[in-house]
Amino acid sequence: MKKAVCLLSGGMDSTTLAYVAKDTGYDIVALHFTYGQRTEAKERECARAVAKNLDALDFVEISLEHFTKIGASSLTDTSIPVEEYAGEEEGVPSTYVPFRNANLLAIATSLAEARRAEAVFIGVQTGDYPGYPDCRPEFIEAFQRAVDLGTAAEPRIVLMTPFVRMSKVDIVRKGLALGVPYELTWSCYQNDDRACGVCSSCHYRREAFRELGLEDPIEYER
């Protein structure tokens, strides 16, 4: 059976992504990163639960403490407030972690090469492009070229981004069809008991369920 490394944060997109990879015929090596984010413990708990539910081959957790030293993100620096959702805005949000996906993809590629996996799955999606430069299709394409140049020829490692042209609603719809246990996932940027309900991540998650006429299975504070 084919093998894939799946970046699994424990959030809604990455969990759906792992189920898509499994449904496509891959055995899953779940890769989870901790980097001093506010909801680190909750994300780890959710990612572990999802990996177990998926019967993943392995759950690999890697710490990237350097992101807390780099700073400049409200996810890793508590002195920077997490913005409440206030409609679509231009520019890079405070929750952007500088060049994070390059770090994550580099390590995921290393793991894929070590495990002889044919693919690395990452859940970048349409809504991420405007504010997160390292989620753009052009960035993924450029990173694929780097992977091709910097890894062994066989097996070729392909970066898989099945959500790159999909909205959050499309992702939830796909996940529901695959039986994704969204009650095991976490999206909130700042709380780890009850989701805040006001950060942009909570907003987009809850709106996706609402557009489908469904109630989000996790509890919200507001």
Swiss-Prot record:
<keyword id="KW-0436">Ligase</keyword>
<protein>
    <recommendedName>
        <fullName>7-cyano-7-deazaguanine synthase</fullName>
        <ecNumber>6.3.4.20</ecNumber>
    </recommendedName>
</protein>
<dbReference type="GO" id="GO:0016879">
    <property type="term" value="F:ligase activity, forming carbon-nitrogen bonds"/>
</dbReference>
<feature type="binding site">
    <location>
        <position position="199"/>
    </location>
    <ligand>
        <name>Zn(2+)</name>
    </ligand>
</feature>
<keyword id="KW-0862">Zinc</keyword>
<dbReference type="InterPro" id="IPR018317">
    <property type="entry name" value="QueC"/>
</dbReference>
<dbReference type="GO" id="GO:0005524">
    <property type="term" value="F:ATP binding"/>
</dbReference>
<feature type="binding site">
    <location>
        <begin position="8"/>
        <end position="18"/>
    </location>
    <ligand>
        <name>ATP</name>
    </ligand>
</feature>
<keyword id="KW-0547">Nucleotide-binding</keyword>
<dbReference type="InterPro" id="IPR014729">
    <property type="entry name" value="Rossmann-like_a/b/a_fold"/>
</dbReference>
<feature type="binding site">
    <location>
        <position position="202"/>
    </location>
    <ligand>
        <name>Zn(2+)</name>
    </ligand>
</feature>
<feature type="binding site">
    <location>
        <position position="188"/>
    </location>
    <ligand>
        <name>Zn(2+)</name>
    </ligand>
</feature>
<keyword id="KW-0479">Metal-binding</keyword>
<dbReference type="GO" id="GO:0008270">
    <property type="term" value="F:zinc ion binding"/>
</dbReference>
<dbReference type="Pfam" id="PF06508">
    <property type="entry name" value="QueC"/>
</dbReference>
<feature type="binding site">
    <location>
        <position position="196"/>
    </location>
    <ligand>
        <name>Zn(2+)</name>
    </ligand>
</feature>
<comment type="similarity">
    <text>Belongs to the QueC family.</text>
</comment>
<keyword id="KW-0067">ATP-binding</keyword>
<comment type="pathway">
    <text>Purine metabolism; 7-cyano-7-deazaguanine biosynthesis.</text>
</comment>
<comment type="function">
    <text>Catalyzes the ATP-dependent conversion of 7-carboxy-7-deazaguanine (CDG) to 7-cyano-7-deazaguanine (preQ(0)).</text>
</comment>
